[in-house]
């Protein structure tokens, strides 16, 4: 697929190829390589925490699974941002070539993350009488994301809703160990 190409699976589900240089929803606060290094540090910290939790044996399986799914999703996004730009040429107006002779479109740690899942659940137009947005297109659930993003978001939601106490216990223990 070329950049911004899409395939309609259903009216409410599309495969839509974009490259995201930032964080969730394309937010870009820092350079890509700084973001990638930050992701690597966070994933390392989460991995150490999972190891400690399993070693202690005091937490429920669902809690460990949720942390592991966050780790897996974040690792997937890191792999994408570290290697995608090195292994592929740009996708503007063409299908990206794998291992191009001239090299990829980005240097190591400066690649983008491929997002492709789009769920435009409601597509309509704002009524013309509506101030500011009148007559403009309205799409409910506009974000485009990937499986790794889903893994991170769903697992974070599960942790906050069902394992909040366990999460705070780990953070408090980590803070106590630092002092």
At which residue positions do the language-model features occur?
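Alpha-helical transmembrane bundles and membrane-interface segments of multipass inner-membrane proteins
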Residues: 1-179
């Amino acid at each position: 697929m070329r950049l911004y190409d899409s395939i309609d699976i259903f009216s409410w589900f599309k495969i839509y190829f974009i490259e995201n240089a930032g964080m969730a929803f394309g937010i870009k606060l820092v350079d890509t390589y700084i973001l990638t290094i930050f992701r690597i540090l966070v994933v390392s910290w989460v991995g150490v925490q999972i190891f400690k939790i399993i070693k202690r044996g005091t937490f429920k399986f669902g809690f460990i699974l949720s942390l592991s799914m966050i780790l897996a999703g974040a690792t997937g996004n890191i792999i994408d941002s570290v290697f995608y730009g090195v292994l592929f040429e740009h996708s503007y107006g063409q299908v990206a070539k794998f291992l191009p002779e001239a090299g990829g479109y980005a240097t190591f740690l400066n690649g983008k993350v491929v997002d492709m899942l789009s769920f435009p659940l409601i597509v309509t137009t704002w009524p013309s009488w509506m101030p500011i947005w009148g007559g403009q297109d309205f799409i409910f659930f506009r974000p485009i994301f990937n499986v790794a993003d889903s893994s991170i978001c769903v697992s974070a939601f599960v942790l906050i809703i069902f394992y909040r106490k366990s999460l705070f216990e780990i953070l408090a223990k980590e803070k106590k160990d630092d002092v």
